[in-house]
Every structure is written in C-alpha cells, then in structure tokens.
C-alpha cells in the first residue's frame, strides 16, 4: 500500500428530488457507463411505481429495504498454516450500505419484469417485507458466518 497521505472521503451531494444522500448513492450504484440521468430515471421511476402500487412513501420503503438487506457479519478468507479458513468478521457501516445496494441492484437485474424500474420497485417492496433475492443473499452470508463461528478467533 502507498505510504502517502490518507485520501479524504468525498462528500456526496444529496439527490435533487428527495434531498437524501442514501438515494444519491443508490443512483450512483445503479449507474452504468457514467449515464447518471438514465440511472436517475430508473430509480425515480421505481419510486413512482412504489407510490402507486403500494401506496407507501418510497423513502420509507427504500430505507426499510436497505436496513433489511444490510449484512451484520460476513466471512473473509484467512490463510493459517497452509489452510484457508473462512473467518467471520463484522461489516463496517459504509460497506454494509454498499453491499446492500449491490445486492438490491443484482437481484433486481435477475428479475423477470419488463423494465428495470419495475424490477427495482418489486425488489425493494419485497426487501421491505423481508423477502426477495437480496434478503436471501444476506441470509446466505449470515449463515456462512454462523457456520464458521469456530474460526472467529483468527480475526484480523
């Protein structure tokens, strides 16, 4: 690793519609090839679908989905004496949010609805109710950590 000064964290501006930093980060997570306006259209379209379909506040659904998908622990590979162990470690808050966004995005992409906005809305509504592909992924990661609890003393 370089021994230069530590790079400062960049402040992310809140999104223009809701004034929320988390939504802005999610738009950036959805974005492909720098096409931010397309990503915004997808996310805001999904929020509109949530409003019409569920009759709920899209920000509440989004935050509920995020909190249900965020992992508490994950496993990291650690080499000890010629053997690789999957060591359970706690997830940092910033990484929790990043993983939750990534899992929401990937499980939305795997869905069968017509547009990405519809897929994203359906995935967020399901995640808010503790079901769906992203929640399944979180449970899988938690199960792996639980199964390898015996190696927790190898923590980094």
Curated annotation (Swiss-Prot):
* GO molecular function annotations of the record: rRNA binding; structural constituent of ribosome; tRNA binding
Gene3D superfamilies, from UniProt?
Ribosomal protein S7 domain
* Pfam families the record matches: Ribosomal_S7
Q: Does the keyword RNA-binding apply?
A: yes
Any single biological process term in GO: translation
Identify the SUPFAM superfamilies for this entry.
Ribosomal protein S7
Which InterPro entries does the annotation name? Ribosomal_uS7, Ribosomal_uS7_bac/org-type, Ribosomal_uS7_CS, Ribosomal_uS7_dom, Ribosomal_uS7_dom_sf
Which GO cellular component term is one of those annotated?
A: small ribosomal subunit
Q: Which UniProt keywords apply?
A: Ribonucleoprotein, Ribosomal protein, RNA-binding, rRNA-binding, tRNA-binding
- UniProt KW Ribonucleoprotein keyword: yes
Give the similarity note: Belongs to the universal ribosomal protein uS7 family.
Quaternary structure note: Part of the 30S ribosomal subunit. Contacts proteins S9 and S11.
Free-text function comment from the UniProt entry: One of the primary rRNA binding proteins, it binds directly to 16S rRNA where it nucleates assembly of the head domain of the 30S subunit. Is located at the subunit interface close to the decoding center, probably blocks exit of the E-site tRNA.
User: What protein does this entry describe?
Assistant: Small ribosomal subunit protein uS7
Species source reads Dechloromonas aromatica (strain RCB)
């Amino acid at each position: 690793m370089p021994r230069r000064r530590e790079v400062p964290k960049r402040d992310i501006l809140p999104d223009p519609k809701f004034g929320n930093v988390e939504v802005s980060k999610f738009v950036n997570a959805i974005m492909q090839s720098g096409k931010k306006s397309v990503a915004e259209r997808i996310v805001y379209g999904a929020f509109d679908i949530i409003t019409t379909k569920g009759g709920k506040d899209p920000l509440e659904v989004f935050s509920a989905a995020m909190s249900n998908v965020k992992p508490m622990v994950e496993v990291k590979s650690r080499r000890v004496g010629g053997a690789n162990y999957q060591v359970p470690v706690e997830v940092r808050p910033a990484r929790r949010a990043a993983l939750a966004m990534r899992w929401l995005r990937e499980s939305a992409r795997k869905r069968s609805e017509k547009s990405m906005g519809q897929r994203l809305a359906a995935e967020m509504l399901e995640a808010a109710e503790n079901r769906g592909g992203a929640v399944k992924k979180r449970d899988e990661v938690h199960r792996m950590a639980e199964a390898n609890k015996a190696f927790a003393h190898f923590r980094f």
